[in-house]
Amino acid sequence: MKKLTIVPSSFRLLSIGSYVELIEANGRDRLFCRGRVLHAHLVTSGIARLTRIAAKLVTFYVECGKVLDARKVFDEMPKRDISGCVVMIGACARNGYYQESLDFFREMYKDGLKLDAFIVPSLLKASRNLLDREFGKMIHCLVLKFSYESDAFIVSSLIDMYSKFGEVGNARKVFSDLGEQDLVVFNAMISGYANNSQADEALNLVKDMKLLGIKPDVITWNALISGFSHMRNEEKVSEILELMCLDGYKPDVVSWTSIISGLVHNFQNEKAFDAFKQMLTHGLYPNSATIITLLPACTTLAYMKHGKEIHGYSVVTGLEDHGFVRSALLDMYGKCGFISEAMILFRKTPKKTTVTFNSMIFCYANHGLADKAVELFDQMEATGEKLDHLTFTAILTACSHAGLTDLGQNLFLLMQNKYRIVPRLEHYACMVDLLGRAGKLVEAYEMIKAMRMEPDLFVWGALLAACRNHGNMELARIAAKHLAELEPENSGNGLLLTSLYANAGSWESVVRMKKMIKKKRFRRFLGSSWVETV
């Protein structure tokens, strides 16, 4: 690709098309300083006021992580019409600024902005990634109000959103309400079923689309492979691969990556490595997604030999420079206890992103290096790097492990008030653990009761563990009751409560719990070692 460069001292008037190319190149490569110089030139020459140029500048600033600067350019646009809003919302959604895109829409809608069909997919994408059901369903209502429900692209986005929420029934209703479904809509629904452990329903839908004369494409087949692979149905995966070939499609990199992903998901790591080798023997070269999918198998078993081989392959092929690959490598080294290797890799990263920062903070947090985690978090804030929900999960984990109760509570509030990030289950689990370790069990329980969502087993598990450490029988019973409802087959929670009764000298309760565990035939989840046997 031809590199576009600018020399500040020798600017001359160029064509509008050339300026557009320069702005796009600076945004793509995140050349913020160079783009600012170009922006200044465009302002002095009067070109910045052109709608097309202003729209490109908005996108440039969002790509560089400068949302406030993007907003300033938008506010100075000569025509703040729907097209400008489409650019602003779309740029935020494409670059991961999901909350900003929703906030911007709320503001514009309050000022009289009518919902435009071009904005809807971006808003639904943001709602999906933020798991903001309330906002997503509000947009769905507006879609019905403005009669956009026959737009196939919008319908596909709605199906994707509801599928991500786990509301497959609502996704199917949206699908069924569309008069004439095309391949894109079918693929969205098939993927929705596959991603929610309903691969058999996905396969039935493929049969339906064939009856309607719509031929499946490679995306259709790969969705089925992914679904059955994650459900650990190897026989069906083989069957789908055969059907795919009979239909004229050869399994591609995505197909093999889906198989590997399912194997890793089900802790069949040796089979995942074998599938990786088979992929190579078929003449297919792994991409960044393949590497990212396979590396967690190395962190689970601490197979550093495999991990280093994959790292070496990434270096040779240039995939190491991919941000998500670099992040996965950091995660692998960190989980295997090789902190120094992770630190070296992080320092060598030329363009650090939110993803790489998050991985390194997690690495420090999980090894008790809270001071370094906080230092890195402060660096992100100081440099204006985007902080997302994972950033706060990582730093709250660090605070919890180090007993930094006040700092953790302040960061939890900062996350909501300054960065407008709605707390997720993982944030609450961190906070319950943080408060529990500090002995603030009542405060932890009050936080659970105030949650806007149903607490999961990690939240209740954190409370039960804290109750055991501090001997709070009353709250322990409450936590154990909820855990028994969420995970009825796991005896571990009952054994934890039994241990608590024993420590308190309540032997009658110990006998009662053991009888209950035996009667219900709870399954005990065995531990495993991360140490590779040689």
UniProtKB/Swiss-Prot annotation:
Organism taxonomic ancestry: Eukaryota, Viridiplantae, Streptophyta, Embryophyta, Tracheophyta
PPR repeat residue intervals: 50-80, 81-115, 116-150, 151-181, 182-216, 217-251, 252-286, 287-321, 322-352, 353-387, 388-418, 424-454
Keywords: Repeat
Family membership: Belongs to the PPR family. PCMP-E subfamily.
GO biological process entries: RNA modification
PANTHER family: PENTATRICOPEPTIDE REPEAT-CONTAINING PROTEIN, REPEAT (TPR)-LIKE SUPERFAMILY PROTEIN, PUTATIVE-RELATED
Protein name (record): Pentatricopeptide repeat-containing protein At5g59600
InterPro entries: E_motif, Pentatricopeptide_rpt, PPR_At4g14850-like_plant, TPR-like_helical_dom_sf
PROSITE patterns: PPR
